[in-house]
Amino acid sequence: PLMNDNFGGLAVGGTRITDPRLVFGGAGPVPLEAVIGPVTVSTDIALNNPTGPFNNLGIPGAKSFHLIAPGYGNLSNFPAAANPYAVRVTGNAPNASIVELAVAQIPTFFTLSEIGGNDVLGYATSGGDGSNLITDTATFDFALNTMVGAMVSTGAKGAIANLPNITSLSYFTTVPHNPVPLDAGTAAFLNSASAYGAYNAGIVQAFAFLVANTPMTQEMADAEIAKRTITFAEGEGNAVVIFDESLTDLTQINPALVSMRQATAADLVVLTAASFIGTEAIPGNAQTVNGVAIPLADKWVLTPEEQEEIATATTSYNASISAVASANGLALVDLNSVLVEASTTGINFDDYNLNTDLVFGGLVSLDGVHLTARGYALMANEFLKAIDATFGSNFEASGNMAKAADYPVTFSPLLP
């Protein structure tokens, strides 16, 4: 939504609620104020909202059902049931839903992009810790059909995009599972009976008990013992230790045997963990290093089981999107295939090859989730191609596609 300046950030009555934007700090993303010093956040949702109406009603963080909810942009409902970015666009109709704001403009054409993306994104960025659940398919389907039904009720045509697999984004692929360097002495201590050696011995004993007294087989026990055994070595490349609720609960046998293991390449460590791994839970106490002595909490890691939940929901949402596009004569934009290509081989856009590497890939912005201006230009072209194919327009044939060179991937910290 329209901001008052390029510093970014939001305030309510002078109190900051979101921070200014990220900038490139030479190696990776850093907060703007770390580069240029303190700035005043001038975009205040209680004081200076524009009145609209707006053609672009995309709301960061909005889930499918939020877009049909009355009052989602009413300041009096913030923060419990309103989104500050929605407050920016509701103007003189604060109780109108986002879809109602769109329909009120009596459009002849509309686009729906990434509907459902936030329904899985919140779960993913919180490491699947349960604080931000995936929207169930029935709720998503109701919201989707309500939106599309409202938009086509005036006779408007439109285009709708399916959802990419968000775990291919750099927010989930940048931080390695094994970033821990250790000297010989530290590695030896961690492997000793004073540290993880005791845990390793304990799980062997616990699984021996389970094999003897429950239906668990020795083969099953051996597989989980191997998964849970924690070892470190001198040098680079040691995996972080994580909590994993999918492991067998052994705490009733021995309270010290919590469900933890070392991460593997199949786990996805979230981008924000980069500044947390290696810090000390108790400053000055080297035996409280997060990710080594203290396992990473669920919010820092997406395990394979959690990734599967996201993939299942995304597949279900995409089936619904395809069905609603077909039923209503909408152009269907396959953004899922675009991200697959970008995250594997890279995707060509004019003279550039864009991929999902953080900062240097050119497609994904510094937050690791949203796209750069060039990335969004690429996606806009995919919409135009689908519109051409469905409605017989000639955006591509007439040369009226977005040009990659017109859209930068980073912006100067000094941009006013």
Question: Where do the model's predicted regions map?
Answer:
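Conserved active-site regions of diverse hydrolases
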Residues: P1-P416
